[in-house]
């Protein structure tokens, strides 16, 4: 594929992904709007109560998480820039993705320490790879 076609394909996938994500509801914990301690967590917890209306999928109550809301495989795993996101733990993994640098954006794993993070950042600059969490220092 030529560079122009790759860009248009990437943009098309990104637009499709945004449309699908806009339709998907924000899954909040049941009663998170009534209790501050539940709302601030913004974490989905499955309701198990016997008479819980969300669990029973009653109309007018929040949607429950299910497989049907998942995005298609072709549009899954993309960074907001439209590039495929790859998590890297060390310099060797960085070298493996160097031949895909036009289609990939690198994310340094959160478990990587400061010293190794600096090594990865220097190598990424050397190879001309884009890093999504470049400014994040743990």
UniProtKB/Swiss-Prot annotation:
One of its GO terms (biological process) is translation. It comes from the Archaea. GO terms for cellular component: cytosolic large ribosomal subunit. InterPro entries: Ribosomal_eL32, Ribosomal_eL32_arc, Ribosomal_eL32_CS, Ribosomal_eL32_sf. Transmembrane segments: none annotated. GO terms for molecular function: structural constituent of ribosome. HAMAP family: Ribosomal_eL32 (MF_00810). Belongs to the eukaryotic ribosomal protein eL32 family. NCBIfam families: PRK08562.1. This is Large ribosomal subunit protein eL32. It comes from Saccharolobus solfataricus (strain ATCC 35092 / DSM 1617 / JCM 11322 / P2) (Sulfolobus solfataricus). The lineage of its organism: Archaea, Thermoproteota, Thermoprotei, Sulfolobales, Sulfolobaceae.
